[in-house]
Amino acid sequence: MDIVDTFNHLIPTEHLDDALFLGSNLENEVCEDFSASQNVLEDSLKNMLSDKDPMLGSASNQFCLPVLDSNDPNFQMPCSTVVGLDDIMDEGVVKESGNDTIDEEELILPNRNLRDKVEENSVRSPRKSPRLMAQEQVRSLRQSTIAKRSNAAPLSNTKKASGKTVSTAKAGVKQPERSQVKEEVCMSLKPEYHKENRRCSRNSGQIEVVPEVSVSSSHSSVSSCLEMKDEDGLDSKHKCNNPGEIDVPSHELNCSLLSETCVTIGEKKNEALMECKAKPVGSPLFKFSDKEEHEQNDSISGKTGETVVEEMIATRKVEQDSKETVKLSHEDDHILEDAGSSDISSDAACTNPNKTENSLVGLPSCVDEVTECNLELKDTMGIADKTENTLERNKIEPLGYCEDAESNRQLESTEFNKSNLEVVDTSTFGPESNILENAICDVPDQNSKQLNAIESTKIESHETANLQDDRNSQSSSVSYLESKSVKSKHTKPVIHSKQNMTTDAPKKIVAAKYEVIHSKTKVNVKSVKRNTDVPESQQNFHRPVKVRKKQIDKEPKIQSCNSGVKSVKNQAHSVLKKTLQDQTLVQIFKPLTHSLSDKSHAHPGCLKEPHHPAQTGHVSHSSQKQCHKPQQQAPAMKTNSHVKEELEHPGVEHFKEEDKLKLKKPEKNLQPRQRRSSKSFSLDEPPLFIPDNIATIRREGSDHSSSFESKYMWTPSKQCGFCKKPHGNRFMVGCGRCDDWFHGDCVGLSLSQAQQMGEEDKEYVCVKCCAEEDKKTEILDPDTLENQATVEFHSGDKTMECEKLGLSKHTTNDRTKYIDDTVKHKVKILKRESGEGRNSSDCRDNEIKKWQLAPLRKMGQPVLPRRSSEEKSEKIPKESTTVTCTGEKASKPGTHEKQEMKKKKVEKGVLNVHPAASASKPSADQIRQSVRHSLKDILMKRLTDSNLKVPEEKAAKVATKIEKELFSFFRDTDAKYKNKYRSLMFNLKDPKNNILFKKVLKGEVTPDHLIRMSPEELASKELAAWRRRENRHTIEMIEKEQREVERRPITKITHKGEIEIESDAPMKEQEAAMEIQEPAANKSLEKPEGSEKQKEEVDSMSKDTTSQHRQHLFDLNCKICIGRMAPPVDDLSPKKVKVVVGVARKHSDNEAESIADALSSTSNILASEFFEEEKQESPKSTFSPAPRPEMPGTVEVESTFLARLNFIWKGFINMPSVAKFVTKAYPVSGSPEYLTEDLPDSIQVGGRISPQTVWDYVEKIKASGTKEICVVRFTPVTEEDQISYTLLFAYFSSRKRYGVAANNMKQVKDMYLIPLGATDKIPHPLVPFDGPGLELHRPNLLLGLIIRQKLKRQHSACASTSHIAETPESAPPIALPPDKKSKIEVSTEEAPEEENDFFNSFTTVLHKQRNKPQQNLQEDLPTAVEPLMEVTKQEPPKPLRFLPGVLIGWENQPTTLELANKPLPVDDILQSLLGTTGQVYDQAQSVMEQNTVKEIPFLNEQTNSKIEKTDNVEVTDGENKEIKVKVDNISESTDKSAEIETSVVGSSSISAGSLTSLSLRGKPPDVSTEAFLTNLSIQSKQEETVESKEKTLKRQLQEDQENNLQDNQTSNSSPCRSNVGKGNIDGNVSCSENLVANTARSPQFINLKRDPRQAAGRSQPVTTSESKDGDSCRNGEKHMLPGLSHNKEHLTEQINVEEKLCSAEKNSCVQQSDNLKVAQNSPSVENIQTSQAEQAKPLQEDILMQNIETVHPFRRGSAVATSHFEVGNTCPSEFPSKSITFTSRSTSPRTSTNFSPMRPQQPNLQHLKSSPPGFPFPGPPNFPPQSMFGFPPHLPPPLLPPPGFGFAQNPMVPWPPVVHLPGQPQRMMGPLSQASRYIGPQNFYQVKDIRRPERRHSDPWGRQDQQQLDRPFNRGKGDRQRFYSDSHHLKRERHEKEWEQESERHRRRDRSQDKDRDRKSREEGHKDKERARLSHGDRGTDGKASRDSRNVDKKPDKPKSEDYEKDKEREKSKHREGEKDRDRYHKDRDHTDRTKSKR
């Protein structure tokens, strides 16, 4: 579109690409904006041109003008210089802007390939609609004819003539070329205005002009001359009747153009292949410019742009070309001058050939034309066109001959020409492409003329020009041969017709050959000038075909080859062009002004759609293709070309239009190249024009769509045929048959529809034409019909492209190629038609327009000439397809696409044989009619076969309505339209589908609904049923596969290979993503399917076959089929299965995951089916039949049911766009132990997920055993919340989706919200419930499916209640998780008794605790603590060793030594197995400490803590003794087993005793679970156990010493000692915890020992914090679930600590001394003891807290750790144990190690500062940070700062802890470990160590109690804290005493151990000893004994002997206290109530 071109001029180069694609749209908009009037176009063009003129200076710079090589001041912008600025600006610029856009773009793009691509794009998407192009072509032909007639006619006449010529050329294959040629001509027209003025002044004077042009802008003038010649030639061709006029104008125009062309070609050939290469470059550039110079003004700038591009591309070539250009310019001057005298000289050839060349050169040009024409038309078409051309000119016969020869050659060379022609076409770019490839300056010259005819003759003209260049008119045959040689050189594939040119092409391709070819090119230019002058009208006519083929061929090959060749050529040409154009611009601008007036009339008419409203269809198309030329000529072309030329030469216009179409597409394809050539040719061309050229080129790029659009987008001067209103900036469509334009609104076409029509090669045919076409179908002669058909094909293609506009430029390229093929035929057709008369041309123009808009319609109803032409067009396209296949094998795939398009058109014609048996392509009307008939026939047949009582008239009406709706829906008869029609046809015809057609006929399914029905809805019931069966089968297979997969361990492929996935977090994340996507996919599938089925159902509602839905594939009466009703499960599931399975598998990382995903999909599908079935029952509710049916009874039941439960969580559930409400979570199944901590305050629902995906995932989780699954029920708090609750429920239920929580805490791997309707079945994966379950009559519920990490949970448990949590989680938790929640809740009341019983019977306690409700747990915290200790003792023996690795693998991953040395409690193992440390830990607590830890252990802990404050002594005495005995036994066995793997047997017996009170967490890996349980269960044997533990402790002390050396290397030795002091079972727990805590605090040690369990638990940091912080926290908030309880507990503990501060201070003093002694060991001991004490009892925790506080003052490190731990406990107690555990373990322990957690806790920091040796990184402070900071369990505690302060204080402790936990600072050998241990657990551990000496004295009991304390502490905060609340407080008292004693000892030991810890081996040994001592001390003495033993051990911990001696001492003290503890513990066991009361 002209305006678009103008806009393109303004488009910056950086936006050129966008402009290319937006060009068509811009054109539409621009056309709308400027189509109102030519003046608007002209003004806008002028304005834009003025912008261009500024662009000459600035805009061009902005638009890559710097790229332009021609800065020649003489080179004037066609727009602004000689050529009428209005003319140039209006039309030349407009067209050129489009062409220049491409040109500029190509200028920007150094590769000619890009330019070719751009050209292709432009060719494919011409600015104007095919009609407009054809009209403009016709107009251009007419105008060219007029110009030719007037010869020296004014610019307007010249423009008209040129425009016409160009239009015809564009109509032909060369219309695109012509656009290029015109663009070049326009570019050269400025010089060529001088040229053409001269040329117009003298026919032979054109030679002068040409010399001038060749000198100043040889290429631009050549292109303009060529354009002029082409225009004239086309006019003469089109005006074969008026060859004289044509000859004259064409001579004049052609002389100027040909003079340039001849100069170019002559230079090319004269320069030989060298110049041919260079000049062809220039010539193609020139032609490129000519394309650009469709806008004559911009053509120069286009040339310049091309020149710049080419210059940029081949600056060296440009130099050569500039030399050559100079040569050419001189040669052209001489040649032009000589042309008159010398045929050899291009000048003489040009001058004489104006008429002489008509005879002589006519033959060579005919030969060239024939060659190219044959290449394009292939023999017959080429001959015909060239014959016509020859007839048109004196050389028509020679042309025919040459065409025959060339056609033969071309047939042969066409294949080569596909590439060579592409080269030639590239050089000629249409005509310019030929010039480019053939070194076809001739072609550029010819392009102006050949734009009309050159597209067929261009190649010939180029060849002729080459021949002429060599021989001029005298050696026309030789020049033809030369042209062939040049072609062969230029386009090697072109062997025969273009061997010479092929030679030129290769030479062009070869930079070295540029000059040679260039000399040939000069010769050729001269010859071509002659030839072009004489036969160029003929040549133009023929060349369009050839050029088109060449362009087509060229584009595939030449775009690659010529991109380089043309780059060189273009550069050479740009140099030549610039030089020549600059020279000729001055000279030629005057002649050019005239010739350009003619040309502008011809070209602009074509170029400017606004200028060519009447001709717009044809002319516009040609002008779009000629865009560059016509734009300058456009103004005159517009008026004259429209009216006169269009009217006078409709046939010519038609041919021209087809040539233009052909030309334009090839030109557009080649334009960028040719423009480059043109630009290269005229290096002097000011780069200022590049913006225009670029815009033009860009427009060219979009020219096909644009030109098609413009054809049918509209001509600005056109008015709507219906409303008679101007464009009005509205989308207009041009009739494919006539020039009438119609508003899209008026004819019911939208731009998109028009584009679709263009894509489908459909034309819009107005009502008049439709009627006329039917009449005219058979009028045209076979030749005319062929020609018309070809033209119609091309027009149709172009129209299709126009319609496609921006839809698919590739398609337009394909069409362009196809059009090029057909245009080759069109050229002949156009020639023939021109021979036949102009009337046919007009008709053809109209037809072309119509065809372009309605090719389909043409097929059915072409105008008589039209239809004949269409019929032949089909034949010709077939032929041309064959030809194209041969000639375009080298051509781009687009050629094949074009061929396919032809075939499609033919097929369409065949389909619509009614109107035309072989119509080239059926029009949209024809297609629609065919569809109507087909539908009617189908319905009538079905109606006849059926017994329906429906009148046949209704069937016809229905068919018509269906087609109407179909068309209105798709807005076009495009592929979608046809596909839908086929679908409808198939389903309506389907004999099995007896419902659809009945519904359709009955009106049950309206046509509007019918066309929107999905294939499934349309399908028959049988088909639908089959699909469902297949889907179901697929689902079943998937489920089966998943079941198999579930049986297999879940593996994950990593860089290490396949590894079993213990943690499903990554998988689940993937699955969640998958599932989330999958649900979406399922939804999408389900929705369409459901909608389809529902639609079917709606249709079948009349019969309402919904109940029979499964019996039919599709029934419109079936609501399900119609989509009105949710499809049954079977229906949706199969479909879902396919999608979901695919999706799931896609997302899955491994087969298991994929299977799981698929299964999940399947499950989702099944679930969806299930829900669908429910929906069928109650369609409204998807998941739950009722939104939330809550009957009063149900509510009562719910309230009654919930009254028995304690909510475990309260917070917000928020789904941003759905609902937000406050809710409480009640346990349903699984262990709710740490949910309070694990669940965020606000659960953010991040999305939806398919239920099946969730259940598949859950199955995998269950199979993995590493996670624990917990189910909670959310209950709204208020009625308002109930509303939101119901909304959220309905949201998910209606979508059959689950909610996915987006903000899970660390321990919660995944959380899903499950909408469970009151009537919904409980998902099978959830049952049987392991917990309270759900009431029988329930309301609509939102369940929370929580998947937690067992191991991490266990680690958390390990940290705080490592033993307890691990034990329950280890053995029972797996089975318990659901039961734990429910049972724990239920058995909360039973807890005390059960705990006693539990101690009595390990199994019973475990089960009872599992059953105990959390509420009871809260009540039974004290008792729970004891049973938990027992449980811990009972459970630890088994997987403790297993867990170390697992636990280590978790958050605080201990070193291998830790793993090996640290036994993992069973809980840790179970946690690792269950996969959720925190969960397992919670479960363990809930199970083991169910009453204590579960439900609200915090409340119990608080109460217990308070009670213990008062009863702390008693509890500590009784419970702690018993608990400690148990703990000691456990800890002894645990520590022994942990430290001494060899003590597994011994520990087993001991562990068995302690198992009763201790969890398996305390169980050392070495100790068998049975032995450990035996320690737990055998309370009476606890002393013996303590003894055995002492033995074990000795072993463990060795191991602990080793481990402590490892752990204590940083700071684990003291934790180990603490563990040792407490007992190894509990000590292991506490050791693990201490290690965890220490690891968290002093990560290395913790990692070594506690870390494994912590790894098994939540994480070692978590474990540490739980063990240290968690102990106090768990004592305070046994379960971290109630954060308040924890806080209260902390408060209570603090109070207890304060109350017991004295004793705590004593203990802390002892422990401080001990801790200071064992700087790290004592911290870890304190931590262990503290954690154990806290775990054992909240009172002990309080004592520990007090001790810690006391220790802080007494200890520098220990006290600090203690106080810090206390602070941490206080804080963490607020936070869930998990948080505390993580914080304390990972944060506090590590913090203690790293100081950051320690120091965050001010007390600890102070104490740390006070006791730097142990507290630089005090463990207790670390523990407290965990408590204080309450880092979410899932969040690892922050890394501790380097041991700056603390470590400096403990110089003995190496800063980097021996065991560096991930994310945690390594423990320091000395102070680090002390500090980390001191921070939290260390104080506890010291307290326990203090107790440990007591326990050692009372070995089994004290140790067991300590162990129990440790274990409860380790087990779970709630359970352990409850459990510890009594025994732990007793231990605290003992620890206080012990700490007082041991604080000094620990200080001493810590000091000495700091040195030893500096030695990692010693620290490891200390760890091992501590473990043994912890277990020993815990067993021996609850607090003090263990602490004493720890203190004793901590000193020996450094030396194993000392540790062993201390262990013995601790065992003695533990035995002493152990006996007391046993008494106490037995009392606690016997008196669980008292323990509870104490708690």
UniProtKB/Swiss-Prot annotation:
The modification Phosphoserine is found at S97, S125, S283, S299, S680, S1014, S1133, S1148, S1178, S1614, S1642, S1898, S1925. Residues 473-483, 1781-1797 have a biased composition (Low complexity). One of its GO terms (biological process) is regulation of transcription by RNA polymerase II. The lineage of its organism: Eukaryota, Metazoa, Chordata, Craniata, Vertebrata. Keywords: Isopeptide bond, Metal-binding, Methylation, Phosphoprotein, Ubl conjugation, Zinc, Zinc-finger. The keyword Metal-binding applies. Pfam families: PHD, SPOC, TFIIS_M. One of its GO terms (molecular function) is zinc ion binding. It comes from the Eukaryota. The keyword Metal-binding applies. This is PHD finger protein 3. A zinc finger (PHD-type) spans 717-772. The modification Asymmetric dimethylarginine is found at R1867, R1877. Residues 144-178, 460-492, 528-555, 596-685, 860-904, 1078-1109, 1171-1191, 1360-1380, 1581-1623, 1643-1684, 1776-1800, 1884-2039 are annotated as: Disordered. Ubiquitous. Expression is significantly reduced or lost in glioblastomas, glioblastoma cell lines, anaplastic astrocytomas, and astrocytomas. Residues 144-168, 617-640 have a biased composition (Polar residues). There is a cross-link at K644, K964, K1931 (Glycyl lysine isopeptide (Lys-Gly) (interchain with G-Cter in SUMO2)). Residues 460-472, 596-612, 642-670, 867-878, 889-900, 1084-1102, 1581-1598, 1666-1684, 1888-1902, 1912-2039 have a biased composition (Basic and acidic residues). GO terms for cellular component: nucleus. It comes from Homo sapiens (Human). Residues 927-1046 form the TFIIS central domain.
